[in-house]
Each structure stands twice: as structure tokens, then as C-alpha cells.
């Protein structure tokens, strides 16, 4: 049975499956054209926080990111050259390489405390580790939750219109 852990400085080089979507490498994809990753980074900069990436560890050779947070992971590693990120890890073992200040998560209140209170996950569970899903944004959620400039909000709305 997996437990959930908050790992404030998870080593990215331990991730064997980053979960990134193919669009990250397609310059003509709407998310690329409208600079979705830039909007994510702008939001993190303005919020002065990075919400955790979801990690599931099956064994030390199978460390999977996602589904929640894979765009954040891609933006932080490829545009900001991060080597460690905050994660919520589901694993049967608390590995030494998780580093310092690891916190075992026992309740949904503890799980939700690691997220921006203005944009809590739409669904979540602590059954056999931690799972959450942010879900697809609506225009109203975008307005309420994205801490970005009006120009970026407009760009993201245009992207949503094109992709929905």
C-alpha cells in the first residue's frame, strides 16, 4: 500500500517518465503558439509559489510524474533549469533520496494544505497514495485563479476557445 509524502525538493533526475504531452515539442500547437508554459511561469512568479507535482513511484526504476503538474514540471525544467521541485509523492517506501523535510500526509486537509487555496484540486483522494486532478478550466475559473496580467488572461482565453 502506498503512502503520500510531501517532498519539498524532489530530485528531477529521479523521474523516469515525465508525463509530458507531445504538444510541448510542437511549435504550431495552440498551447505552444499561445505560450501556455509562459503563462504557468508568470502565474508562479506572481503567486510566489509552486504547487506540487504529482509523482507515483512503482519502484526505483519506475518514477512517474503526473498526471497533475506535468506542464509545470516541463516549464520549470526546460525553461528555468530547475533540478529539484516540490512534489507530492505516492510510494510504498520513503526513500533516503527524497531529501530533508519530507512530511507524510495522512489526511485530506494535510494534502490540500500544499495547494494554493484559490485553486484547490477539483477531485482528490488519499487511497493508496495521493491523487488529484485540477480539471479543465472554464473562463470563470481562469479569471478567478490565474495570477497573471490581463494580456496573458486574454491569450489563455483565446487558446481555450481554439482548443475546446
Could you say what each language-model-derived stretch is?
Residues 22-25, 41, 69, 102, ...:
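Polar low-complexity intrinsically disordered regions enriched in Ser/Thr and small residues
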Residues 28-36, 87-90, 108, 149:
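Short, structured coil/loop segments at alpha-helix boundaries
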Residues 49-111:
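A short, basic-hydrophobic beta/loop patch
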Residues 1-65, 77-78:
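Short alpha-helix boundary/capping and kink motifs at helix termini
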Residues 18, 37, 76, 148, ...:
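General helical structural elements
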Residues 90-164:
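Amphipathic, charge-rich alpha-helical segments that serve as recognition/docking helices
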Residues 4-5, 9, 33-35, 57, ...:
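Intrinsically disordered, low-complexity N-terminal regions enriched in serine/proline/glycine
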Amino acid at each position: 500500500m502506498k503512502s503520500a509524502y510531501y517532498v519539498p525538493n524532489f530530485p528531477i533526475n529521479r523521474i523516469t517518465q515525465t508525463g509530458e504531452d507531445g504538444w510541448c515539442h510542437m511549435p504550431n500547437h495552440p498551447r505552444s503558439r499561445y505560450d501556455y508554459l509562459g503563462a504557468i511561469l508568470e502565474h508562479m512568479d506572481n503567486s510566489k509559489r509552486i504547487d506540487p507535482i504529482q509523482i507515483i513511484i512503482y519502484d526505483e526504476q519506475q518514477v512517474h510524474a503526473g498526471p497533475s503538474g506535468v506542464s509545470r514540471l516541463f516549464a520549470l525544467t526546460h525553461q528555468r533549469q530547475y533540478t529539484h521541485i516540490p512534489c507530492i509523492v505516492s510510494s510504498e517506501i520513503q526513500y533516503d533520496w527524497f531529501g530533508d523535510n519530507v512530511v507524510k500526509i495522512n489526511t485530506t486537509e494535510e494534502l490540500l494544505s500544499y495547494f494554493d487555496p484559490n485553486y484547490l484540486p477539483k477531485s482528490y483522494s488519499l487511497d493508496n497514495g495521493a491523487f488529484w486532478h485540477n480539471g479543465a478550466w472554464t473562463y470563470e475559473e481562469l479569471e478567478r485563479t490565474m495570477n497573471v496580467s490581463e494580456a496573458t488572461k486574454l491569450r489563455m482565453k483565446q487558446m481555450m476557445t481554439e482548443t475546446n
